[in-house]
């Protein structure tokens, strides 16, 4: 989603608060909880899950391995839930021609760098760069090349834009900023 006027362009960036991330966190939580329950029931000799008898799974080595996978899955699930709740990666890109300033804001993990705020002068922007890699794991990324800073990604790599859409977005942004486009 974006908002534009003659002198200001604001591009809102969706972070990790997506339906797919929610589904993966939920599925991983349920699966790892199941593994942990099976491992615990094999250790205690009681049936926590009524699908099979606890005597079918011997604690050493199957029960230990299932408990380990359950605990590891719960940690990964906790990480996914935290990134989902904190909305890591969301923010905005603000291009202001009137002031000649570009502001990039992203939410990070809690701590010193929770708020990531970058500010550049428009005259320091060298170009808008498109990186396209076709194949099995196709990747299309839009970068802003800054003098002395390198390339800053403007679009998340997991967003599946077509080549036409990324070219259109790059052309509009390059026209607005009055900079050239580079393709790699």
UniProtKB/Swiss-Prot annotation:
It comes from the Eukaryota. The keyword Transmembrane applies. The chain crosses the membrane at residues 22-42, 57-77. It is found in: Plastid, Chloroplast thylakoid membrane. GO terms for cellular component: chloroplast thylakoid membrane; photosystem I. InterPro entries: PSI_Ycf4_assembly (IPR003359). The keyword Thylakoid applies. It is a multi-pass membrane protein. Coiled coil: none annotated. One of its GO terms (biological process) is photosynthesis. Keywords: Chloroplast, Membrane, Photosynthesis, Plastid, Thylakoid, Transmembrane, Transmembrane helix. Seems to be required for the assembly of the photosystem I complex. Belongs to the Ycf4 family. HAMAP family: Ycf4. This is Photosystem I assembly protein Ycf4.
């Amino acid at each position: 989603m974006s908002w534009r006027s003659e002198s200001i362009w604001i591009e809102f960036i969706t972070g990790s608060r997506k339906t797919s991330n929610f589904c993966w966190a939920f599925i991983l939580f349920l699966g790892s909880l199941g593994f942990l329950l099976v491992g615990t029931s094999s250790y205690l000799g009681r049936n926590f899950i009524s699908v099979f008898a606890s005597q079918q799974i011997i604690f050493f080595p199957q029960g230990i391995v299932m408990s380990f996978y359950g605990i590891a899955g719960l940690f990964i699930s906790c990480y996914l839930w935290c990134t989902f709740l904190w909305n890591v990666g969301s923010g905005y890109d603000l291009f202001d021609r009137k002031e000649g300033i570009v502001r990039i804001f992203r939410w990070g993990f809690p701590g010193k760098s929770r708020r990531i705020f970058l500010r550049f002068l428009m005259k320091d922007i060298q170009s808008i760069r498109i990186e396209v890699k076709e194949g099995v794991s196709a990747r299309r990324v839009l970068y802003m090349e800054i003098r002395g800073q390198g390339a800053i990604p403007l679009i998340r790599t997991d967003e599946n834009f077509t080549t036409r859409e990324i070219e259109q977005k790059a052309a509009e942004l390059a026209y607005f900023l009055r900079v050239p486009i580079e393709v790699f």
